[in-house]
């Protein structure tokens, strides 16, 4: 990790007007700061500041510190109307909030605010959220504190869904033991893709990658059920393991990394496009196969 975090969020302005394509920088940070209950955290802080509390200026170990600025690295971004949601997974100590937002009308380096509010500390670690056609924010909470040499599964991995019109938590669904084939599986649940239209809000499906143990978890909102799918095309390519960076060779074995959907056809079926992170190929499968537990899918390269 570099000394400074720098991430740019880009808005394509030509979507709003008939003009030549031009990319504008919406936000840029060197390091992240937070505002929680009106308190600004822009430097390392041992304790969370609370009204009328008494504090002693004693040093504490990193695993007890409330905020360690250098450790806060953003992972996922999603936009809904004037809000940009930013996730900070707990891969190090000192992460005050894993799900946050800023306003599009903010300055170029706004402070993050916990979503939906400062009481969201029941969320452990989120990567890449998604907003669906029904105005809902979906995410997978891995439940895992992923600090090297201190990995701790604080709670079972779960799907969380928020109503963005009311900012209420609509659903928290814990994944089943059969969805997770080893203790490594929770750390691989880094993305969720929602299959729904504005006319079928109660019949949504979600497709979750598991890059760590190379599978896919499918969730049905109507059935409130989930199931795991295994296939060779979800696995890393053993001929593409080695990456050379700055003259150093790194071996990587991540499997299924992301899933994208086509527009639905006249029957409501989509194509799901996906790939393992370590692979030279892109694959497709129809969502009808994914929605039917136990059915053998036909995957195409």
For the regions a language model picked out, list residue spans one by one.
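N-terminal signal peptide
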Residues: 2, 10-34
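Surface-exposed loop and turn segments in beta-propeller and other repeat-based domains
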Residues: 30-66, 108-122, 168-187, 226-251, ...
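Blade-loop segments of beta-propeller domains
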Residues: 64, 72-73, 98-157, 170-179
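Beta-rich, blade/repeat-based domains predominating
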Residues: 67-80, 120-137, 179-206, 236-272, ...
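Conserved beta-strand positions in repeat-built beta-propeller and related beta-rich domains
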Residues: 86-92, 139-143, 203-212, 270-278
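Short consensus segments that form the blades of beta-propeller domains
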Residues: 89-92, 147-153, 207, 250
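Structural motif
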Residues: 94-100, 149-150, 154-160, 214-218, ...
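Short loop/turn segments that connect beta-strands within beta-propeller blades
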Residues: 103-107, 163-167, 220-224, 286-290
């Amino acid at each position: 990790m570099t000394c400074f975090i720098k991430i740019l969020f880009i808005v394509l302005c030509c979507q709003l007007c008939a003009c030549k394509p031009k990319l504008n920088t919406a936000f840029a940070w060197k390091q992240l700061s937070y505002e929680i209950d009106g308190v600004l955290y822009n430097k390392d802080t041992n304790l969370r500041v609370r009204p009328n509390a008494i504090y002693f200026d004693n040093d504490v170990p990193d695993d007890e510190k409330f905020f360690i600025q250098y450790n806060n690295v953003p992972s996922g971004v999603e936009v809904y109307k004037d809000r940009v949601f930013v996730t900070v997974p707990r891969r190090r100590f000192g992460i005050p909030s894993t799900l946050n937002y800023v306003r599009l009308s903010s300055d170029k380096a706004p402070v993050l605010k916990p979503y939906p509010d400062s009481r969201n500390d029941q969320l452990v670690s989120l990567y890449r959220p998604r907003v669906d056609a029904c105005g809902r924010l979906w995410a997978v909470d891995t439940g895992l504190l992923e600090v090297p040499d201190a990995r701790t599964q604080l709670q079972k991995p779960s799907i969380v869904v928020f109503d963005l019109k009311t900012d209420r938590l609509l659903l928290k669904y814990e994944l089943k033991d059969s969805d997770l084939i080893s203790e490594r599986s929770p750390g691989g649940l880094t993305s969720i893709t929602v299959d729904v239209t504005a006319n079928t809000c109660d019949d949504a499906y979600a497709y979750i990658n598991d890059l760590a143990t190379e599978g896919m978890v499918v969730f049905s909102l109507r059935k409130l059920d989930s199931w795991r799918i295994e296939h060779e095309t979800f696995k890393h390519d053993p001929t593409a393991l080695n990456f050379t960076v700055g003259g150093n060779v790194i071996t990587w074995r991540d499997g299924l990394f992301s899933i994208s959907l086509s527009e639905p056809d006249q029957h409501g079926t989509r194509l799901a496009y996906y790939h393992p992170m370590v692979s030279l190929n892109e694959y497709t499968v129809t969502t009808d196969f994914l929605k039917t537990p136990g059915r053998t899918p036909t995957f195409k390269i």
